[in-house]
Design a protein with these regions (language model features):
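Residue position within the beta-strands of beta-propeller blades
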Residues: 1-3, 51-56, 124-128, 181-183
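Short, acidic Ser/Thr/Gly-rich low-complexity loop/linker segments typical of extracellular
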Residues: 252-269
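Signature of short aromatic-glycine-proline-rich micro-motifs recurring in repeat-based ectodomains
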Residues: 36-59, 101-121, 177-179
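Structural motif
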Residues: 8-17, 60-72, 80, 133-149
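Short loop/turn segments immediately following beta-strands, especially the blade-tip
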Residues: 19-23, 69-90, 154, 160, ...
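Surface-exposed loop and turn segments in beta-propeller and other repeat-based domains
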Residues: 25-36, 77-107, 164-179
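Beta-rich catalytic cores
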Residues: 11, 36-41, 64, 112, ...
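Aromatic- and Gly/Pro-enriched helix-to-coil junctions and flexible linker segments
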Residues: 212-223, 231-234, 238-240, 279-281, ...
């Protein structure tokens, strides 16, 4: 099945598989190596497990139509028959190379495809429509016409099978004998108790196949595996949508709503286990003694299901073994139950306007706005940059954004095709990273004070610095002092952690607790 993956800058559709009881959800293809945005309408090639024909599309305004793509997700290195799929080794072959797959979906004169299905001898049954098959059809008030065709990828020839011009002809299935699929025995109760927790964890978080380097704070080009060895806790974050209330976006960020269920310990062998509410989407942040890091993939589990990965993006073709014996320390200790908590007990970080919660603005007002409020004592007083925006209607708008103002006075900005009002602190810190392609910044443009999802790369976190847990003399950026302590103002480690968490969660303005007219979650017993 195809799954929409939206987490901050990640916004695409990937190919997944799972058991009929919705357990053991795994990525098959699309996380690595694809040159297009989205994989949709995939069908496994009969007799070739791990290979698929699918549609590659740019996602936006294409009616899920695009090029026909062959996906080979079989591992090229594994000798274990149970590990024959490897998302990291998936290969993509465009069977209709003339069909563009870029985000712009330009005119090509070759039409677009939907719902391919292999019928043997290299032939495919497809739906095809002439033209661009995108939003330009709406502008021209001309709907695309999909008919059913037999397609030969080798010759690029289409043979018409059926076309009713009054409707779309899609999802054609050949009527023919097929092998009865095997029965997969359920691993969870057919009628599970939704309050029963799922268990998630890792064998060894240092096991990774990603060849990435980590920078920021104590790291300067350190390989990811070495950086993960310094992780002390796993932060577990629930994601939720704007259905919580009357908001289209969660602020000047592409990140979703976020709530921290807890930070469970990572043991000396790299293992961890935690109980979490079932069904919900989570992403994980392995954090070090300074409380900083991130991971960009949603995971889910059923009630009573145990999901244990090998590491952090470990090789899907290898078996990860415990470092210190037959079982991990986390297995011996048992799952951390403190993370199986109801909605009111989860940590959310509304920026402003949540009367029953600590707001990010409360931290800034308490520690920072006394100097950075645009007044006479502010070293950045009078500094600003100008943002020019051309709206979809062609109107030119101009906004003055303060270089750094951490007060709660409301100012205007432009984001996602609308004029928005937020506290100056939020716009100052978030706008340098939030400006879209329809904006042009002129003048005294500041650094990216907050990089959503990356506290380690956020300038404001670097300037303030952070102390290690249990050692106030151990600084994340060892070559610079704590700020504003160097100016005679003391900030608690707890307040610093709120700012770090706000950045690492994605820099959201809204949470469940500050949406006007939203539900009162204070008495909610839901998981």
């Amino acid at each position: 099945f195809s799954r929409w993956e939206h987490l901050g800058p990640v916004n695409d559709v990937k190919l997944f598989r799972m058991n009929p009881d919705c357990t053991n959800m795994q990525a098959i293809a699309g996380q690595f190596g694809k040159s297009f945005n989205s994989i949709v309408q995939a069908q496994e090639v009969p007799g070739e497990p791990g290979t698929f024909v699918t549609v590659a599309t740019s996602r936006r305004g294409t009616i899920q139509a695009g090029a026909v793509m062959h996906v080979d997700a079989r591992s090229q290195t594994s000798t274990n028959p149970d590990l024959y799929i490897d998302v990291q080794q998936a290969r993509f072959t465009n069977l209709t190379p003339d069909v563009p797959t870029g985000m712009g979906s330009p005119p090509s004169g070759v039409g677009r495809y939907r719902t391919p299905r292999s019928i043997g001898d290299g032939l495919l049954l497809v739906s095809w429509a002439d033209g661009d098959v995108n939003e330009r059809n709406e502008l021209a008030d001309t709907a695309p016409n999909f008919g059913i065709y037999l397609f030969d990828p080798e010759t690029q020839r289409r043979t018409l099978v059926y076309d009713n011009p009054d409707m779309w002809d899609v999802y054609a299935i050949p009527v023919r004998p097929r092998d009865e699929p095997p029965v997969i025995t359920p691993t969870v109760d057919a009628n599970p108790d939704p309050s029963e927790p799922a268990i998630i964890g890792s064998i060894d978080i240092t096991a990774t196949s990603l060849r990435e380097n980590v920078n920021g704070a104590q790291f300067d080009g350190v390989p990811l595996g070495e950086a993960l060895a310094q992780a002390t806790r796993m932060r577990i974050i629930e994601g939720f949508s704007s259905e919580i209330g009357s908001v289209g976006q969660f602020g000047l960020t592409m990140h979703e709503g976020a709530a921290i269920l807890g930070e469970t310990p990572i043991y000396e062998d790299g293992s961890w286990r935690a109980a979490v509410p079932a069904y919900l989407p989570y992403h994980l942040q392995p954090i070090d003694r300074y409380s900083i890091r991130n991971q960009m993939l949603w995971i889910q589990a059923m009630p009573g299901e145990t999901r244990t990965c090998g590491g952090c993006h470990e090789s899907r073709s290898d078996t990860v073994e415990p470092r210190m014996g037959a079982t991990t320390i986390a297995q011996q200790v048992g799952p951390d139950m403190s993370t199986h908590i109801a909605i009111p007990d989860r940590v959310e970080l509304p920026w402003y306007g949540a009367p029953s919660r600590e707001n990010v603005q409360d931290v800034l007002t308490r520690n920072c706005a006394g100097c950075h409020d645009g007044g006479a004592m502010d070293p950045y007083a009078g500094r600003f940059y100008t943002v020019e925006v051309t709206t979809m209607e062609g109107e030119m708008l101009t906004f003055e954004i303060p270089y750094l103002d951490l007060s709660d006075r409301l100012i205007e900005a432009y984001y996602e095709d609308e004029v928005v009002n937020y506290p100056a602190s939020y716009v100052s810190l978030m706008y340098p990273s939030a400006m879209m392609g329809d904006s042009m910044a002129l003048g005294d443009v500041p650094p990216e004070w907050v990089v959503p999802g990356e506290a380690r790369a956020s300038r404001v976190i670097e300037v303030m610095n952070m102390t290690a847990e249990g050692d106030a003399g151990d600084l994340a950026w060892a070559d610079r002092p704590l700020h504003p302590e160097d100016q005679g103002v003391d900030v608690s480690r707890e307040d610093r952690m709120i700012l770090i968490q706000a950045a690492d969660l994605g820099g959201q303005y809204y949470s469940r607790w500050n949406v006007e007219g939203g539900y009162d979650w204070s008495a909610a017993a839901d998981y």
